[in-house]
């Protein structure tokens, strides 16, 4: 069975940002206890810690705009994904550039989850 990593990455990214933009606390199910987030240099570990970090971000509204993700399979059967785009927070007129990398893994039941997540604003 071959892994259609590009399709999985595209579906994952659409789901992730749709959920993030509508209600960040609902992202908790995409992480596990051994997941790690690095957000602008600050690390959070585990689904609870990551959800706390994401829901504590200092904005009310956010909209992510991004191009097609780049994806590759990993040696361990996972998928690494790179996303670049812009986000608009609250009612700001100027979007902020960002880059985000995900490493997806599968749990024992075969469900995909975010093992690693790195987010960085791209300020020029």
UniProtKB/Swiss-Prot annotation:
<dbReference type="GO" id="GO:0061608">
    <property type="term" value="F:nuclear import signal receptor activity"/>
</dbReference>
<dbReference type="InterPro" id="IPR002075">
    <property type="entry name" value="NTF2_dom"/>
</dbReference>
<dbReference type="InterPro" id="IPR032710">
    <property type="entry name" value="NTF2-like_dom_sf"/>
</dbReference>
<keyword id="KW-0963">Cytoplasm</keyword>
<dbReference type="InterPro" id="IPR018222">
    <property type="entry name" value="Nuclear_transport_factor_2_euk"/>
</dbReference>
<keyword id="KW-0653">Protein transport</keyword>
<keyword id="KW-0813">Transport</keyword>
<dbReference type="Pfam" id="PF02136">
    <property type="entry name" value="NTF2"/>
</dbReference>
<protein>
    <recommendedName>
        <fullName>Nuclear transport factor 2</fullName>
    </recommendedName>
</protein>
<dbReference type="GO" id="GO:0006606">
    <property type="term" value="P:protein import into nucleus"/>
</dbReference>
<comment type="function">
    <text>Facilitates protein transport into the nucleus. Could be part of a multicomponent system of cytosolic factors that assemble at the pore complex during nuclear import.</text>
</comment>
<feature type="domain" description="NTF2">
    <location>
        <begin position="8"/>
        <end position="121"/>
    </location>
</feature>
<dbReference type="GO" id="GO:0005737">
    <property type="term" value="C:cytoplasm"/>
</dbReference>
<dbReference type="GO" id="GO:0044613">
    <property type="term" value="C:nuclear pore central transport channel"/>
</dbReference>
<dbReference type="InterPro" id="IPR045875">
    <property type="entry name" value="NTF2"/>
</dbReference>
């Amino acid at each position: 069975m071959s892994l259609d990593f590009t399709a999985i990455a595209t579906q994952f990214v659409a789901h992730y940002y749709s959920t993030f933009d509508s209600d960040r606390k609902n992202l908790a199910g995409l992480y596990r206890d051994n997941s790690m987030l690095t957000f602008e240099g600050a690390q959070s570990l585990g689904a609870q810690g990551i959800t706390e970090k994401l829901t504590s971000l200092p904005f009310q509204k956010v909209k992510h705009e991004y191009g097609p993700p780049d994806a590759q399979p990993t040696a361990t059967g996972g998928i690494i994904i790179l996303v670049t785009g812009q986000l608009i927070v609250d009612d700001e007129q100027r979007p902020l550039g960002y880059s985000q990398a995900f490493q997806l893994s599968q749990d024992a039941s075969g469900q995909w989850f975010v093992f690693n997540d790195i987010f960085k604003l791209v300020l020029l």
